[in-house]
């Protein structure tokens, strides 16, 4: 196991599509992701991407978009990075970072969409500011996206989901077209997921847990 982990760390250090602190170009593409991708296509993020099932799955389905997966764990990012290389995906990239540092990698208006897929619910009140669907992060997403930018959120955790719905009532966020379901797999909204499932999602479904999902769009500030 240790040998496999070392091989993955070495991959992360050498591969071109994964950005991490040890690399000189770690933050080089802020405001210039079109230079990395060599096109002006929309940039869509998967925050807390884990194994990056949505980053790679959506990238394969929609080559007209660029997808970037972000996570703090390099071992997780290895999966998306290596799969992208193996399958010839040129419209993906991966960044190892704490997600509160998003604005160090993107200029305001540079991001057109954000997927939040099964984040850690951070149930303690002392951890509230670390919830990826909390007000602190929603304000970060708001600054990164222009009017029309879309956020998509999936979780098995009903408490976190209901908290997120409450967060979205904050008038300073200025959102529209909020749509949600507490049971995605019994909803017409399921078609928007194109059969993509995360590892966590498969586990929860096997346990009979319902999946919550919402999406909305930002209005002009």
UniProtKB/Swiss-Prot annotation:
Q: Where does substrate bind?
A: 156
Its GO CC terms are:
tRNA methyltransferase complex
Q: Where is the active site?
A: 120
Q: Which residues bind S-adenosyl-L-methionine?
A: 46, 71, 120
The yes or no answer to whether the keyword Cell inner membrane is present is: no
Keyword annotations of the record:
Methyltransferase, S-adenosyl-L-methionine, Transferase, tRNA processing
EC number(s) given by UniProt:
2.1.1.33
Pathway(s) the chain acts in: tRNA modification; N(7)-methylguanine-tRNA biosynthesis
The protein's annotated catalytic reaction(s) are: guanosine(46) in tRNA + S-adenosyl-L-methionine = N(7)-methylguanosine(46) in tRNA + S-adenosyl-L-homocysteine
What are the protein's GO molecular function terms? tRNA (guanine(46)-N7)-methyltransferase activity
Q: Record's superkingdom?
A: Bacteria
Q: Which InterPro entries match?
A: SAM-dependent_MTases_sf, tRNA_(Gua-N-7)_MeTrfase_Trmb, tRNA_methyltr_TrmB_bact
Q: What does this protein do?
A: Catalyzes the formation of N(7)-methylguanine at position 46 (m7G46) in tRNA.
Q: Which family does it belong to?
A: Belongs to the class I-like SAM-binding methyltransferase superfamily. TrmB family.
Q: Which NCBIfam families match?
A: PRK00121.2-2 (NF001080)
PANTHER family this protein is in? 3-DEOXY-D-MANNO-OCTULOSONIC-ACID TRANSFERASE/TRNA GUANINE-N 7 - -METHYLTRANSFERASE (PTHR23417), PENTACOTRIPEPTIDE-REPEAT REGION OF PRORP DOMAIN-CONTAINING PROTEIN (PTHR23417:SF14)
Q: What's the protein name? A: tRNA (guanine-N(7)-)-methyltransferase
Q: What is the organism lineage in this UniProt record?
A: Bacteria, Pseudomonadati, Bacteroidota, Cytophagia, Cytophagales
